[in-house]
């Protein structure tokens, strides 16, 4: 089995009546993204003639892993997914070696892959997505509001909740939250880890109320 399953078992043993162990893993979309970007595509094409066959294999591997970690007791699984942050960045076309139309195709491919990996999951398994924007050496990897992925990620990804970074102006406003569908939850990242200075408490509370207007 995957070594992450053993890692989870270690954390699971520390649970008590007030805690639920959560496992975080790279999202399927994050996985394929790294294989279809220009720097990797030539090597990927040695093994996969197109992205669909690659996505099918990735989805199958994730479904097997999800089943294994569920059997180990996991009931809260988080996809860490930098791909959506990259897709809204002003440099997205350069990152992916395509134009705006090509970006729309990639968005659909990533959404389809994530949903394929999730499909058939047990009803009592919570799966969330964290849209990570990078935090290497306390700096960010990409910028851009969520508007460009609202109708794919927020409206149509079949997760239970989104963990979204809104800790500075780079992430845009809360308006895209109107696209969140169904009874999905949103966890707001309003307190940054990129600097030591704490946010103003009243300011954070005000931003929570502002975000609530769109949900």
What are these regions (language model features)?
Residues 1-215:
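Domain-level signal for soluble alpha/beta catalytic cores
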């Amino acid at each position: 089995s995957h070594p992450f399953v053993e890692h989870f078992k270690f954390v699971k043993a520390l649970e008590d009546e007030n805690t639920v162990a959560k496992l975080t893993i790279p999202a399927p979309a994050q996985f394929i993204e790294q294989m279809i970007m220009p720097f990797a595509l030539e090597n990927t094409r040695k093994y996969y003639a197109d992205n669909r066959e690659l996505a099918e294999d990735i989805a199958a591997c994730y479904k097997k892993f999800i089943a294994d970690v569920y059997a180990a007791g996991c009931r809260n699984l988080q996809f860490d997914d930098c791909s959506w942050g990259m897709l809204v960045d002003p440099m997205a076309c350069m990152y992916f070696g395509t134009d705006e139309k090509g970006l729309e195709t990639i968005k659909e491919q990533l959404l389809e892959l994530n949903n394929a990996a999730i499909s058939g999951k047990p009803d009592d398994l919570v799966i969330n997505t964290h849209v990570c924007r990078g935090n290497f050496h306390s700096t960010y990897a990409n910028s851009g509001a969520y508007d460009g992925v609202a109708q794919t990620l927020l409206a149509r990804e079949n997760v239970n909740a989104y963990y979204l970074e809104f800790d500075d102006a780079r992430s845009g406003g809360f308006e895209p939250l109107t696209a969140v569908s169904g009874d999905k939850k949103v966890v707001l990242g309003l307190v940054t880890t990129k600097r030591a200075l704490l946010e103003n408490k009243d300011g954070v509370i005000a931003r929570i109320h502002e975000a609530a207007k769109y949900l």
